[in-house]
Amino acid sequence: MLIFLDIDGVLIPDRRHETPSSLAELMKFNSDCLNHFENVLRSYPNARVVISSSWREIFPFEVIPPLFSPDIASRIIGFTPSLNPKNIHQHKYLRHQEVLEYLRQNQAENSPWVAIDDIPEHYPPDSPLVAIDDYNGFDQNSAKVLSEYLT
């Protein structure tokens, strides 16, 4: 099972009103959100994570896995591709299209997957999606929904 993971609003809730004072602070995941997410993954050792966040446009891949616990970091396998900027306007569900392109590029079109995102409008209504409340981030309810997809 592939998990396409957004970061902002998921592992970093939007409830922080102050501006981060450093890059390290900006990149710090909420410990509760991270624990809920990682604990679900520990119950499903075959699940792999692909980063679908805009972070992939800011940071090289090598920066992201170390932000997770080592046992989870080893299961983060890549980024979704960025689509050609000339064609972006043609896609109603941009993140969904990036997921489909990742699956195509990796010969995984028939692989089961689920996305975790705080903007459900990035995906068609029938998509396998754990929709996150960006104020709370990935919480116990999110963990339950993700577990149902992974079972």
Predicted regions and their residues:
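Short helix-terminating capping/connector loops at secondary-structure junctions
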Residues: S43-N46, A108-N110
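Short, active-site-adjacent cap segments at secondary-structure transitions
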Residues: L11, E57-F59, E121-Y123
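Short His-Asn-centered micro-motif
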Residues: L5, S52-I58, I116-D118
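Substrate-recognition element of Asp-dependent hydrolases with the DxDx(T/V) motif
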Residues: Y44-V63
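C-terminal cap/substrate-recognition subdomain and adjoining C-terminal extension
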Residues: E62, P66-T151
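Active-site neighborhood of HAD-like aspartate-dependent phosphohydrolases
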Residues: M1-P45
